[in-house]
Amino acid sequence: MTDRYAWVGALEREAPDIVAAWRGIDEGRFLSVRREVRRRSGTGTALGTVAQLAATADALSDVVERLPDHAFALPGGEGDWNVAEAVGHVATSRSGLVLAASLAAGDRWPPGTPAVLPGIPGPATGTRDGLVRRLDQSQRVIERAARAVEGHERDACPLEHPLVGRLRCGEWLLFAGVHDLMHLEQLHDLSAALARQ
């Protein structure tokens, strides 16, 4: 592992399943991601995955807290979004995926729900404090919503994502963490680039 990925080793101790699934994306082995997500999302894993999602939320918040003020208007690594938009997107996505899993697990899925629209940015003017607050709020939503998934991790979830397809309820929890790491990598790369200036 290069210095570019030093942060991964620290996070892996607290979020081993999420990091293991994410490594497939980082290494260009995309089919392995789905396999790892499925393998690590079986019955009885929801509460452990929530603890791992808390670790990824903390890691995201740590990077956001260290960025200089001007960084939030810089490119955020996702299309033409700035950092504030990318972090806002992460906060909304992580809680939204877990909420969807909880609705399916509780047999409360709304009929006629359209497919997910990926790539919706957060507000462009997000501030450090506001983004950290949104990440904290997303984790609280996850902790409440995931209780419904406990014992239903292998239940089908009708959530349709055009890039991911369909996953089981517990798999969406773990995938929320993989998505966190995709953006966390972008933030670490930006932070390192700013440090070299």
Model regions: which residues?
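A hydrophobic membrane-anchoring alpha-helix module
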Residues: D180-A192
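Short, helix-capping/interhelical loops that line the mouth of catalytic, cofactor-
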Residues: T2-G48, G96-D136, Q197
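Short, contiguous, helix-prone interaction/anchoring segments in small proteins
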Residues: V33-F72
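Histidine-centered active-site/metal-ligand motif
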Residues: H89, H161, H179, H183
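Short, hydrophobic, well-ordered secondary-structure elements
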Residues: D80-V98, L184
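Helix-loop segments that flank and shape redox-cofactor active sites
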Residues: D58-A84, G106-G112, A148-R168, L194
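Acidic/histidine-rich alpha-helical segments that form the ligand environment
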Residues: Q52-E65, A100, V116-A156, L174
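Short helix/strand-capping connector loops at secondary-structure junctions
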Residues: V33-R40, P121, P158-E171
